[in-house]
Design a protein with these regions (language model features):
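Soluble extramembrane domains of integral membrane proteins
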Residues: 17-110
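Proline-rich intrinsically disordered, low-complexity coils
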Residues: 12-15, 33, 49, 122, ...
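Charged, low-complexity intrinsically disordered regions
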Residues: 40, 80-192
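Active-site acidic/histidine clusters and adjacent loop/turn architecture
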Residues: 2-26
């Protein structure tokens, strides 16, 4: 009995009216020159010409009388690092984005080595500075790494009062910056 109640309470709750896959369908149109393959209703995979595979999944977030469905772009790989490291990035500059600052949330010593390596490649920082992202995280744990970017565009805002639905499309410039950043980071992590 207790187990059933616990599972029900911990079950993911999606906002009322959320339809899995609608935002991904619109994003797929923005990624038209690239091959997209559906993995499930809430996730798909982008396959770049060089063979890099990027996973995209929907991330719904409830608000008062509305909800936002944003898309998270994920990249996975193998590394020689075994320690748990979490690195996040912020863009400095209020009116104009100037530079990216990396900071370590977990695994300070090894994390600082990864941050130093990221800072040795200014092109990655310049690309990320121009990219409009909400959240950017690099997780490393037990020889695996995962890079996740939540973009401001490629998201949908659904309001119940007044009833409306608005998709913020991923422009071709932002698509280029996003895919370039993911490709460069994949190449960099291959060196670790």
């Amino acid at each position: 009995m207790f187990n059933r109640v616990w599972r029900r309470l911990n079950k993911p709750r999606y906002p009322a009216g959320y339809q899995a896959g609608v935002t991904l369908s619109r994003l797929e149109q923005n990624l038209s020159p690239y091959c997209c393959e559906r993995l499930s209703a809430k996730s798909m995979q982008i396959i770049l010409p060089d063979g890099l595979q990027i996973e995209v999944c929907e991330k719904p977030k409830a608000l008062f009388l509305a909800y936002i469905v944003s898309c998270c772009f994920r990249l996975h790989g193998i590394t020689s690092l075994k320690e748990k490291i979490v690195i996040k990035a912020k863009v400095k500059g209020i009116f104009r984005r100037k530079s990216v600052t990396y900071y370590c949330c977990r695994g300070a010593e090894s994390g600082q080595q990864v941050i130093d390596l990221l800072n040795q490649y200014p092109l990655i920082g310049e690309t990320l500075a121009e990219l409009d992202f909400r959240d950017l995280t690099l997780n490393i744990h037990q020889g695996q790494w995962q890079f996740e970017v939540e973009h401001f565009a490629a998201s949908e805002i659904v309001s119940r009062l007044p009833a409306s639905r608005r998709y913020l499309r991923l422009t071709s410039e932002q698509r280029y910056l996003l895919l370039s950043a993911l490709l460069m980071l994949s190449q960099l992590m291959g060196k670790l």
